[in-house]
Amino acid sequence: MNAPSFTGLPTSMLSVKMICSECREDPPNLVEEFSSGDTVCGSCGLVLGDRIIDTRSEWRTFSNSDEASGDPSRVGKVANPLLNGSQLDTTISSYDGAGAMLAKAQGRSVQVRGEKNLLTAYKEIGAMCDAISLPKVIADTAKQLYKRVDDHKALKGKSSQSIIAACIYIACRQGKVPRTFMEICTLTNVPKKEIGRVYKTLQRMLTEGGALHNSVDALKGHEYIQSSSTSAEDLMVRFCNRLMLPMSVQSAAAELARRAGLQGTLAGRSPISIAASGIYMISALMGYPKTPKEISEVTGVSDSTIRIAYKLLHAERKELIDPKWIANKAGNMDAMLPKP
């Protein structure tokens, strides 16, 4: 049985050719100019179509190099939320030496006003955070805080260095990576009193009701949360690591600081002084003795301050010390502890 034939039905041409109306060449010599979005006859130059879509694959950027082969992307880099302006500036190619010089000159001429100061501050914040091994999230938070201050023209009359120091200190507390005022002072070369004044002013602005509390953040998710003061337990890990003390000493020193806080043995003393004196006592008790001078070099607390705080701990040693902390369980506590 033969299958039905469809030869009698009309057919349509599914292949449509675009031929130049002037030269009528077949096959046509068509050129797609993606840079202008036009379809042009390669023989006579007649434009046959416009607004064509570039279907070629787009390049992705894996390099920050300024060389000609460094960034093949044609759409530019992503906008930086920490900078002002639209950041849609025209740039000059740096293909050769002359182009590189022109690119630098053009970049300086079109730079958004005030952006240079922000970039300088961000560079300093990044370098300072790297110097004391702070994670990137702390540096980003400090930069965001600095931008909020700059946008609202807050803290007028204060030096940029003192503002940077205060921003890093607040960022450390927000990120649960505490650093002392003395460490920030040594890092930034800003007097401790100046950092303290700027920090208190900035903290008031960031808390509820302050000038910066309801401002729109440059980085979403970085809301300011007022934190409590740094405790001695928070400082133990870093100080003990720098003194090459084992984990057992860290845990015992942190517990000693907690007990001293509950009993009020060192009431009124700074957390760093409590941490230093606790390390001095526990390191000797557990067989890893450190001198006040060694502890002073790490913590920044003077020898005399460590000895005075230790004297108060020594007076209540029986209530504060757990017998299992003694290196030689059968040993005498008083024989192992240094005399106050």
UniProtKB/Swiss-Prot annotation:
Its main location: nucleus. GO terms for cellular component: nucleus; transcription preinitiation complex. The keyword Zinc applies. A zinc finger (TFIIB-type) spans 16-49. Pfam families: TFIIB (PF00382), Zn_Ribbon_TF (PF08271). Zn(2+) binds at C20, C23, C41, C44. It is found in: Nucleus. Keywords: Metal-binding, Nucleus, Repeat, Transcription, Transcription regulation, Zinc, Zinc-finger. General factor that plays a major role in the activation of eukaryotic genes transcribed by RNA polymerase II. Belongs to the TFIIB family. This is Transcription initiation factor IIB. It comes from Schizosaccharomyces pombe (strain 972 / ATCC 24843). The gene is sua7.
